[in-house]
Swiss-Prot record:
InterPro entries: PH-like_dom_sf, PH-like_domain, PH_domain, PHLDB1/2/3_PH. It comes from Homo sapiens (Human). The gene is PHLDB2. This is Pleckstrin homology-like domain family B member 2. CDD domains: PH_PHLDB1_2 (cd14673). Pfam families: PH. GO terms for biological process: basement membrane organization; cell migration; establishment of cell polarity; establishment of protein localization; microtubule cytoskeleton organization; negative regulation of focal adhesion assembly; negative regulation of stress fiber assembly; negative regulation of wound healing, spreading of epidermal cells. The modification Phosphothreonine is found at residues 504, 550, 574, 898. It is a peripheral membrane protein. Interacts with FLNC. Interacts with AMOTL2; interaction may facilitate PHLDB2 localization to the myotube podosome cortex that surrounds the core. Part of a cortical microtubule stabilization complex (CMSC) composed of KANK1, PPFIA1, PPFIBP1, ERC1/ELKS, PHLDB2/LL5beta, CLASPs, KIF21A and possibly additional interactors; within CMSCs KANK1 and PHLDB2/LL5beta appear to be the core components for targeting of microtubule-binding proteins KIF21A and CLASPs, whereas PPFIA1, PPFIBP1 and ERC1/ELKS serve as scaffolds for protein clustering. It is found in: Cytoplasm; Cytoplasm, Cell cortex; Membrane; Cell projection, Podosome.
Length: 1253
């Protein structure tokens, strides 16, 4: 609201100030603009290849330059008014003031009037310096940048049309949303404010409607006054709007433009040419019946009226008759083509040229033909400052018309306002964001490539920066590859390079890397740099080819780069009339380069051989590891099978135990059934005798009674025996059940333990299988890596051979058909340090001295002598060295090319640096090459590290002594074979004899894997025969000493191996002894545990047998409370009225079977703990005592489950009281009374005292 009030206040102030002198200022501005338009000016701008979301080709970009005729005559000349641009201090924001001074202008308005030379691209600061004088007043008004500017990096999205300037433009245009919805503004007249610019349909119609209402309210009081001012100025002049008047907002347009009703005061702002130039045949195939009749004219041109925040041009008859206007609507068939056109647009030069072409086209003397118009429009598609871009649906639905009013509404397709759902909107935003990110990446890579090329150009002129050009060239090549991946098609570069002038291209590439202050000097630099910046495809190739002519620093790690650089550096670049001295220098340089290439060849061969050895070693290790894992897996599988067998045995044992117990129970039951049958027979016999006794005569009654008495006694004895047997059978069954339970639990524990062991072994076997698979896969990966590295080395070897062949051809061409000499003295070693070359040459200013090489043989840097020979003057000592070498060559001191090469230095300075097995050796007067790192003559450190690594892995994995000794033997053989196969030549021809004995064996070491014996053994007799006799004697002495050293070394290794073997044997013996002791200890512990468990089980079994089958033991305490004891047992005494219990007594009726005569009679029983008797009476008065049972006679009380009671009134309520003499059968009146009596009587069953412990 504050911002709105500020804008309204400024509008009122300017209206008041401009009303007075509006006519005078408008006349002055018209004349001044005419003069400026007649003066030819070429506006230069800097094009940034900006492919981010700000200028995304997938959005609709509207360009609306409108030609306006000064007179209604068709022959009138269209005068183009140049835009007025103000240079704003502190930023690159320029504004175009396309309005008269009598029309009110608000401060933020220049945001919409800001122009650029190309599709909304910011203009260079130096390109518009000539406008600052006239527009200083306007620059003061524009010095304050709106907070929501399109130049702000935070607000570059499709909603940026609602910046402050956009709000002002919308207020100026009146209620345009009502026009869009179908309403009319005919009563309001033409809009009062005339501005140039473009805006888009807002993303949210609701927000646009809200803002439009505010606009109409804000502009209502001033409508009449503006109408009068507009009518006064309409006859003074009409403005011709430049082609970039709509470029800013058009570049940010994210939807279709707003439509409005064409009134009589409005000119159709924009016309579209046919799509023939784009090659789209759909345009011509579609019938005109697809569009309304009011849209199509005779020339098939589509009149697309657009009014948003821009000015409404005044309609004249001349403008209606001209079907061509200075701006076209380029409608690409897809966002891909739109992006291509946006990237291909170059500079404002093309825009101005096209404006001139449009100007010529409107002139009657320069009318455009059909072919010319196509060419102009095709050019415009690539050079247009603000081309409107539609998608495929809009292209097929559009037609051109001129001179006819457009309908009130127009169907909108594929725009953001036509999106109906949230998912469509999110997809629309996602596509635009991905496009912006991709184009930002293209911009970044392009800028990085250009900056790298410019830095290369800056370093190219410096002689000291030759060493860093190689990596920069690689950076350029890498950036070019990434750009090729991101480029849309080959047509983009064709459009871009074919249509871009060298001057424009240079300024485009230099814009991002130069500061703003340097932009003014781009015009002068463009002429000198036009010849350098050719199109991209040829420009980069020429630049890279020039840069590769400078030799990069050679390195043994990259033999190809070293050899190629040295080969390129020695190519003759002098005219044919060179002197003999220069030719000889070039030939010598070629010889040195040949030595480097030969050394590289030998090194590559050695590396290939080392890789083969590593592959063999990897195979051997894989076999050994797989064999170990296989053996361990087999042992685990065997143990697993054993444990499974033990588990099956335990299961069988459990089944057998169950079966045995069932058999025992069956036997006892059969025995008990036999005793029961016998007892039943005796009872039947006794019953028969009783019946006979009743029927027998008196004479036989006495005899029968005696017999009946004997039978009764026998029956009583048998019944007691049966009861005892039954009791024993029950005890036996309980004991069997207990044993079964204990044994079953033990067996189940063992079963569970073995099952856990089986599961763990299965997991271990699975882990072993996974480990074996992992080892095989790892070995396969290593093998693939070795094969890849070997292939790379073979390719490098082939390149070196090709370089050598090319070098020999060049040497032959320079030397007149002669080949390379075979003199060994001319074949210098490639591993020469820089100070070694600088000392004989006497000049060490350009190159830094190097006194020590790295230890790694693969990383030893080789310095070709060519660069030094070409850049440094030759000294007298060097010429003397050359003369000595020529003399030796004439004397025949040379070897064949197949023999090893030696390193020869000048006789003045024989010192050199050497690296042997990772140790730096100080320069010495004499050092055999057997200890130098030439041609891979020593074991590479990578092989030694590989051997040590494999040995440590074997020791960690616990290999036995045989495997260790075998590994040592193979390693020693591998070392000897590697050293003996290396090519070494003994340098013994140019050194004095007095220094031999002092310094010959300075580098000899027993720890080194290299040996002088193997190095010298490679020398053939031909090598030695050319030396003197003293040299032969020296060599023989050396061989003898080396043999002794080698024997000593072998002896030390053997003694060390024997010591390790003894230690390992002792360790294994100790380990075996400890395992035996641990096993014995475990066995004894398990045996002891078993004995303890067995004793405990025996004691528990005895204690269980001491307890009788009765429920409670007798109680003999004096303070025993019988009533509380019964209640504690769970009985409810109060509800059982058949029994009366006190603390010491229990009374109640029971039915008792007689002893002699088996009759059942009801008796009153009294259990008295004071008298310690269980007596029964005839009635409850306790007067007539019928019998007494003492506590000492009661043995046990139990329920009559065998139904032994004869003719019991109620067998279910019958229980027995066993004494020493007889068994009393009693029947309780109720079940609760029976349970209470049994618990009471058992407390006095003191006949069980012998079972107590």
């Amino acid at each position: 609201m504050e911002e709105h009030s500020y804008i309204q206040k400024e509008l009122d102030l300017q209206n008041g100030s401009l009303e007075e002198d509006s006519v005078v200022h408008s006349v002055e501005n018209d004349s001044q603009n005419m003069m400026e338009s007649l003066s030819p000016k070429k506006y230069s701008s800097s094009l940034r290849f900006k492919a981010n979301g700000d200028y995304s080709g997938s959005y609709l970009t509207l360009s609306q330059p409108v030609p306006a005729k000064r007179s209604p005559s068709p022959l009138g000349t269209s005068v183009r008014s140049s835009p007025s641009l103000a240079k704003i201090q502190g930023s690159k924001q320029f504004s175009y003031d396309g309005t008269d001074k009598n029309i009110p202008m608000k401060p933020p308005t220049p945001l919409l009037n800001t122009t650029s030379s190309l599709s909304g691209y910011p203009l260079g600061r130096a390109d518009f310096d000539h406008y600052t004088g006239r527009d200083s007043e306007r620059a003061l008004r524009l010095s304050e940048k709106p907070p929501y500017s399109k130049y702000s990096s935070r607000h570059k999205s499709h909603d940026n049309v609602y910046s402050l300037g956009g709000l002002e433009g919308r207020k100026a245009s009146g209620s345009l949303l009502a026009m869009w919805n179908g309403s009319s503004l005919s009563d309001a007249g033409p809009p009062p404010i005339s501005r140039s610019g473009a805006a888009s349909m807002p993303s949210s119609p609701k927000q646009a409607r809200k803002m439009s209402i505010q606009d109409s309210l804000a502009l209502q009081p001033k409508l009449t006054r503006h109408k009068e001012l507009a009518s006064e100025n309409i006859n003074l002049r009409t403005r011709k709007y430049s082609s970039s008047s709509l470029s800013h907002m058009g570049a940010y347009s994210r939807s279709l433009p707003r439509l409005y009703r064409a009134t009589e005061n409005q000119l159709t702002p924009l016309s579209l040419p046919p799509r023939n130039s784009l090659g789209n045949s759909k345009r011509t195939k579609l019938g005109e019946k697809d569009l309304p009749h009011s849209v199509i004219d005779n020339d098939n041109y589509l009149n697309f009226s657009s009014l948003s925040s821009g000015a409404l041009p005044y309609k004249t008859s001349a403008s209606e008759g001209n079907p061509y206007v200075s701006s076209t609507l380029s409608v690409p068939a897809s966002p891909r083509v739109a992006r291509k056109m946006l990237l291909a647009s170059t500079s404002s030069c093309a825009s101005d040229d096209f404006d001139q072409a449009s100007y010529v086209g409107t002139n009657p003397s320069h009318s455009l033909l059909a072919g010319e118009s196509d060419r102009v429009f095709a050019t415009r598609r690539n050079f247009s400052c603000g081309s409107v871009e539609f998608d495929e649906a809009d292209l097929e639905s559009l037609r051109q018309a001129s001179g006819t009013p457009q309908p009130a509404l127009r169907e909108r397709k594929s725009s953001i306002s036509s999106i109906s759902g949230r998912d469509d909107l999110m997809d629309y935003h996602r596509r635009q964001r991905e496009e912006r990110l991709r184009e930002q990446e293209m911009e970044r890579l392009e800028r990085q490539r250009l900056e790298t090329i410019l830095s290369l150009c800056a370093e190219y002129t410096k002689p000291d920066s030759r060493l860093s050009t190689g990596t920069t060239v690689e950076d350029v090549q890498k950036i070019n590859k990434e750009l090729e991946k991101l480029q849309l098609s080959d047509e983009e570069s064709v459009f871009e390079e074919a249509l871009m002038s060298p001057d424009t291209r240079y300024r485009c590439h230099r814009k991002d890397s130069l500061p703003d202050a340097d932009l003014a000097s781009c015009g002068s630099l463009s002429q000198s740099s036009a010849s350098f910046f050719t199109p991209r495809s040829t420009r980069n190739d020429e630049l890279l080819s020039d840069l590769t002519r400078t030799p990069p620093p050679p390195s043994s790690t990259f033999p190809k780069a070293s050899s190629e650089s040295s080969y390129l550096s020695i190519l003759p670049k002098t005219p044919e009339g060179i002197s003999e001295e220069q030719r000889s220098q070039e030939l010598a340089a070629m010889e040195e380069t040949r030595i480097v290439i030969l050394n590289n060849l030998e090194e590559l061969k050695q590396k290939i051989k080392d890789i083969n050895d590593q592959m063999d070693e990897s195979f051997r290790e894989l076999d050994m590891e797989c064999a170990l894992l296989d053996g361990e897996q087999k042992s685990e599988t065997t143990e697993l099978m054993k444990e499974k067998e033990i588990l099956d045995h335990l299961n069988r044992k459990i089944a057998e135990l169950e079966k045995n117990i069932v058999g025992e129970k069956t036997k006892e039951k059969v025995k008990l059934d036999a005793e029961r049958e016998k007892l039943e027979r005796l009872q039947e016999l006794y019953s028969e005798q009783k019946t006979q006794l009743d029927n027998c005569p008196e004479s036989m009654r006495e005899q029968l009674q005696q017999q009946l008495k004997r039978d009764a006694d026998l029956l009583d004895v048998e019944s007691k025996h049966f009861e005892d047997l039954e009791f024993q059978q029950l005890e036996h069954e309980s004991r069997l059940d207990e044993e079964k339970e204990n044994l079953t639990q033990q067996l189940l524990r063992e079963v569970a333990e073995y099952q856990r062991n089986i599961v763990s072994r299965k997991e271990k076997i699975s882990a072993l299988k996974k480990q074996a698979n992992h080892i095989v896969q790892q070995a396969q990966r290593e093998q693939d890596h070795f094969v890849k590295e070997k292939n790379n080395l073979i390719m490098m070897l082939q390149r070196e051979k090709e370089n050598l062949c090319n070098l020999e051809k060049k040497y032959s061409s320079l030397s007149g058909g002669k080949g390379f000499p075979v003199n060994p003295n001319t074949l210098k070693e490639g591993y020469i340090s820089v100070n070694e070359i600088n000392e004989p040459c006497g000049n060490s200013t350009n190159l830094s001295p190097s006194t020590q090489f790295p230890a790694d043989a693969d990383a030893v840097a080789t310095e070709p002598a060519t660069a030094v020979l070409a850049s440094q003057p030759q000294s007298k000592e060097h010429f003397r060295s050359l003369e000595e070498r020529k003399k030796q060559h004439k004397e025949g001191l040379y070897l064949s090319d197949t023999l090893p090469r030696k390193k020869t230095t000048s006789s003045i300075s024989p010192h050199f640096s050497s690296a042997t097995m990772g140790r730096s050796i100080t320069p010495k007067a004499h050092l055999p090459l057997g200890q130098s790192n030439s041609c891979g003559s020593v074991l590479p450190p990578s092989l030694a590290a590989m051997a040590k690594d494999s040995e440590s892995r074997r020791m960690l994995r616990g290999y036995n002594h045989q495997q260790m000794s075998e590994g040592h033997r193979q390693k020693s053989e591998f070392y000897n074979r590697t050293a003996s196969e290396s090519n070494v030549y003994l340098n013994s021809f140019h050194y004095p004899d007095h220094s031999y004995k002092d310094q010959a064996f300075d580098t000899l070491s027993l720890d080194s894997s290299d040996s002088m014996e193997t190095s010298i053994s490679a020398c053939s007799p031909d090598n030695i025969s050319s030396a003197s006799t003293s040299n032969i004697a020296r060599i023989e002495e050396m061989e003898r000493l080396l043999k002794q050293a080698h024997a000593e070394k072998t002896r030390l290794l053997e003694s060390r191996e024997r010591e390790m073997e003894a230690k390992k044997r002792a360790l294994e013996e100790e380990k075996r002894r400890r395992e035996i002791l641990e096993k014995r200890l475990q066995e004894e512990t398990s045996q002891r545990q078993k004995l303890i468990e067995k004793e405990v089980k025996i004691r528990e079994r005895q204690r269980a047998q001491a307890r009788p089958l009765t429920r409670y033991l007798p109680v003999r305490k004096e303070d025993f409370d019988l009533r509380s004891h019964v209640e504690t047992a769970g009985h409810n005494i109060d509800t059982c009225y058949h029994v009366s219990i006190t603390e010491k007594t229990c009374r109640g009726f029971l039915i008792k079977m007689g002893g002699k005569i088996k009759t059942w009679k009801k008796r009153w029983f009294v259990f008295d703990r004071n008298k310690r008797t269980f007596s029964y009476y005839a009635d409850k008065h306790e007067t007539k005592l019928k019998g007494v049972i003492y506590f000492q006679a009661i043995e046990e009380v139990y329920y009559d489950h065998l139904k032994n009671a004869n003719k019991s009134p109620n067998p279910l309520l019958t229980f027995s009281v066993k004494t020493h003499d007889r068994i009393y059968y009693m029947v309780a009146p109720s079940p609760e009374a029976m349970r209470i009596w049994m618990d009471v009587i058992v407390t006095g069953a003191e006949g069980y005292t012998h079972f107590l412990l």
